[in-house]
Amino acid sequence: MSHLVGLVRAVQANYYRVRLREPSNGVEELLCVRRARLKKMGQQVCVGDWVVVSHPDWPGQRGAIAEILPRRNQLSRPAIANVDQILLLFALADPPADVHPITRFLLTAEGLNVEIQVVFTKADLVSPQEQQQWRDRLQQWGYRCHVLSLTQGIAWQALRPHLANKITVVCGPSGVGKSSLIRHLTPREDIRVGAVSDHWHRGRHTTRHVELFPLAEGGWIADTPGFNQPELPPDPRQLAAAFPEIRQRLSQDQCLFDNCRHDQEPGCCVRGNWERYPLYIEYLHQLETIASAEPSLAKVPLVKAKSDRQGQQRLEPLLDAKKYRRRSRRQQHQHVNPMAEEVLDSEW
């Protein structure tokens, strides 16, 4: 029997909805569990993973995930794999656009090495002049952006060609219209949409878990549970590469020192009067402070390589010797003898 390969469409508790690449026996999707072997090896199954399914129960439409195929990339929070592009949504008003959170989301997306699309929503709440100002601003940063209004039906259909045949992840702060956009793009009626809080001027987030929704033009789109403070790159040396403005300057010139931090070093070609440079310096100092305070911790391996009779290597879970190793006969006798002595002592 050939292997069944499918795409993990949703994860809830310990169950995974897997859409089969090729439907079989009239079944397109299986509700699966993760094999214990994968759990012992510490391999987490993410939405967006391509997996091998074993032991299908066609009448019950169930199965077990036996293997996770190699990933091209992975978004850590929330966990979603094999992303083709990031759709970053920000509101022009209610809540108003802010350079700081926009930049932090962009830095997170840059770390994935995938295409980035920037979308501004609620265009009906600001003037055309302000809409154009943000378009020009993003262009100076190195990004193209779309401006739309879901309530007025402005320009959202123009997004469809950019989503075809791709796995697209929709990210952004709460209350900017992520769930509303997905509801416009997909036929699903069970996507919850919430209003912005009148007191906090922030969104009441309605997405509870990560899920891929199919698009009519092919491809998948995922809403993500909101996170208001996306993470900066873990290594300060990676920060500069996440700014298109810095990449553009380094492509035209070079700094005097190869290890230039683009801060106070002489002969730096990056330092200058561009809008987000103060943000770069602020984030650089934050990361350097964190890096100097945290000692490097070596990760304990969870798997070991073992060769079979054909000489092919396969991975097996590396079990805790103290927990799983069987006692030798000598150890068993050593354990039994003191017990026997205690019995003899009690008889006397």
From Swiss-Prot:
GO terms for molecular function: GTP binding; GTPase activity; metal ion binding; rRNA binding. One of its GO terms (cellular component) is cytoplasm. Binds 1 zinc ion per subunit. Its EC number is 3.6.1.-. Residues 72-230 form the CP-type G domain. Pfam families: RsgA_GTPase (PF03193). Its cofactor is Zn(2+). Zn(2+) binds at residues 255, 260, 262, 268. Keywords: Cytoplasm, GTP-binding, Hydrolase, Metal-binding, Nucleotide-binding, Ribosome biogenesis, RNA-binding, rRNA-binding, Zinc. It is an enzyme of class 3 (hydrolase). It is found in: Cytoplasm. NCBIfam families: PRK12289.1 (NF008932), ribosome small subunit-dependent GTPase A (TIGR00157). Belongs to the TRAFAC class YlqF/YawG GTPase family. RsgA subfamily. One of several proteins that assist in the late maturation steps of the functional core of the 30S ribosomal subunit. Helps release RbfA from mature subunits. May play a role in the assembly of ribosomal proteins into the subunit. Circularly permuted GTPase that catalyzes slow GTP hydrolysis, GTPase activity is stimulated by the 30S ribosomal subunit. This is Small ribosomal subunit biogenesis GTPase RsgA. The lineage of its organism: Bacteria, Bacillati, Cyanobacteriota, Cyanophyceae, Acaryochloridales. The gene is rsgA.
